[in-house]
Amino acid sequence: MDCKVVSLNEKDQFIPKIKSSDPVITGLFQYDAAQQTSFEKRMSKENNGREAALANVIREYMSDLKLSSEQELNIQHLANGSKVVIGGQQAGLFGGPLYIFHKIFSIITLSKELTDTHKQQVVPVFWIAGEDHDFDEVNHTFVYNENHGSLHKVKYHTMEMPETTISRYYPDKAELKQTLKTMFIHMKETVHTQGLLEICDRIIDQYDSWTDMFKALLHETFKAYGVLFIDAQFEPLRKMEAPMFKKILKKHQLLDDAFRATQQRTQNQGLKAMIQTDTNVHLFLHDENMRQLVSYDGKHFKLNKTDKTYVKEEIINIAENQPELFSNNVVTRPLMEEWLFNTVAFIGGPSEIKYWAELKDVFELFDVEMPIVMPRLRITYLNDRIEKILSKYNIPLEKVLVDGVEGERSKFIRELASHQFIEKVEGMIEQQRRLNQDLLDEVAGNQNNINLVNKNNEIHIQQYDYLLKRYLLNIERENDISMKQFREIQETLHPMGGLQERIWNPLQILNDFGTDVFKPSTYPPLSYTFDHIIIKP
């Protein structure tokens, strides 16, 4: 597999500014992610004393998996005080989208580089956000149909949308297998298809909860790298978190004030507010099989779906004795994660790291230091067919990754068109606009006639526009093979107006290039970069 790094002219300059140590951006975080001294400081930080208990919890969580020797060793390293590189994500259908795998590769790559540089073991940890309840975000994925040159949405359907946390959701296995079958119908048959389908079927048969199936697929893929997994909703982990839940409840107003102040500061720097929440407690409570947002009205803590209320002593008592009923929101999850782990760096996506920029004062309030916040690696897979099509039409890969292919497609069509025809139609449009202005001058002051002239002009312009569009459409239809190839480029490299990794599913790559494509023996060794990585399997 070939691997190269390209620099893109990104529309969003947040990550390039992190790369260049822009003082406005670095001032939003505790550490400058582009400076080696930041890593030296984090590597030398004193541990919090929770590492042995945390290692036991992770071992228990992964007890339904057959651990690799690398994972066994990393659990031991964690118990002995090794620091971690961590990142997480919701449990997407069939492991998707691709950027989840890329986030794990980011964690693996950075932890290895730190281990090699500092001669201290750094453990890769992936945090499954099983406490989330927005099932609409994880119940679907996309598959690319090569025959049609188009993407198709594949969705797991359920009669009732679960309102509990994703970790508490148990999908219908028959329906899930039907969803899997639908996905594979769209994918081309390869020598890897049957083996991959058997792996997925076995996972569905062997595991029951949505997040356990997700965990099993990730484990199958990344166990050889020694990656450790933990679900935020795992009950033994929640019991460890009880002291912090109590602190959050006691300081909820100060926490909310700190968050709002930091968010306002980021907006004053010209950034858009990322975290949208009305709560002033920033916790959820599981009640009546629903994950309910907690808010405080000045006298009581109130649940948003059942309107159940608690006085402070009651809700703190729940946190102490039944912490598994609580879960964090986007504000408190990073805080809880860092309170638990001895983290060198947190790996986040482009939007995620902007969330963290709004939390600096929250960390300081609880005397928890924000770790180095690193943008994850961004990766695109380029196969031989798409590379040949790009070459055929002389289209730069970097341009497609940023802007898509529509501009190049339009340019191609116009080059095939009669320039005289287009010029004459455009000339007629310009002539009509001049005529319209002359007529308006003639009827100035008479609103009825002004309306009549403008309406007449609108009809003429629409007719000329229609003529030009239909003429170009006819050229498209006469060149349907080329149009399909442009569509292939778009759906492969810039699907739905964004990067491939945000839409494509990992099963597509596994099916095309083999079930071992992500394994250490096959996948190219990566170096951490803020730029874009192109991999040619």
From Swiss-Prot:
Q: Which UniProt keywords apply?
A: Coiled coil, Ligase
**Which enzyme type, at the first EC level?**
ligase
From what superkingdom does this record's organism come? Bacteria
Tell me one Pfam family matched here.
Rossmann-like_BshC
InterPro entries this protein is in?
Answer: Bacillithiol_biosynth_BshC (IPR011199), CC_BshC (IPR055399), Rossmann-like_BshC (IPR055398)
Any keyword Ribosomal protein?
A: no
**Residues in coiled coil:** 422-450
Q: Name one GO molecular function term.
A: ligase activity
EC annotation from Swiss-Prot or TrEMBL: 6.-.-.-
On whether Cell inner membrane is a keyword of this UniProt record, the answer is no
Function recorded in the entry: Involved in bacillithiol (BSH) biosynthesis. May catalyze the last step of the pathway, the addition of cysteine to glucosamine malate (GlcN-Mal) to generate BSH.
**Family membership noted in the UniProt record:** Belongs to the BshC family.
What protein name applies here?
Putative cysteine ligase BshC
